[in-house]
């Protein structure tokens, strides 16, 4: 007598249904890993910017340059322009030289890119940086001038970025913040 081994049609259908249910349950978790990774990276970048700008402010205080506009402070051989102790939002040949990471400098948002291109520029590198940008080009709730860092595959209008921004009124800094916007990550 010959014995046949294999799956019946019902067993095969049950296996396919179970795999389908598992895929539906597991897929959202795997799909959100990229989002979680982008958010974690941006939070680390913002924390680094916060520590860096606080350190530069401390250096300006030590050198008695925190009460003057448009003064230079040297940190680790890098000259940083400050406004009342807050570092200017210049990445290239300035803050970028003091940050570790795989950043790609896109350009100056005010002179090189302009309002429309700043918001719509799509990052093709791991992390892109646009500096010297009126923060209102990107987000109306951020005051002053900003530096924006965003991940590959995103533009600033996608609302997935880290930023450093500050505002001054001619006699003091009125706002200085390093943070993230991650609603669109």
Q: Which sequence ranges carry the predicted segments?
A:
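N-terminal single-pass transmembrane signal-anchor helix
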Residues: 1-41, 48
């Amino acid at each position: 007598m010959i014995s046949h081994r294999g799956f019946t049609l019902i067993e095969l259908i049950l296996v396919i249904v179970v795999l389908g249910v598992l895929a539906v349950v597991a897929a959202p978790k795997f799909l959100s890993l990229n989002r979680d990774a982008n958010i974690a990276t941006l939070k680390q970048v913002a924390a680094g910017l916060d520590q860096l700008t606080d350190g530069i402010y401390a250096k300006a205080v030590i050198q008695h340059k925190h009460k003057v506009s448009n003064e230079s402070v040297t940190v680790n051989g890098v000259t940083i322009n400050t406004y009342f102790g807050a570092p200017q939002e210049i990445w290239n040949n300035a803050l970028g030289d003091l940050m570790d990471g795989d950043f790609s400098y896109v350009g100056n948002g005010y002179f090189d890119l302009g309002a429309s291109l700043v918001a719509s520029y799509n990052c093709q590198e791991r992390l892109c940086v646009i500096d010297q940008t009126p923060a209102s080009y990107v987000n109306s709730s951020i005051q002053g001038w900003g530096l924006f860092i965003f991940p590959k595959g995103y533009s600033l209008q996608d609302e997935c970025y880290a930023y450093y921004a500050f505002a001054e009124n001619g006699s003091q800094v009125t706002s200085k913040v390093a943070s993230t916007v991650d609603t669109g990550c």
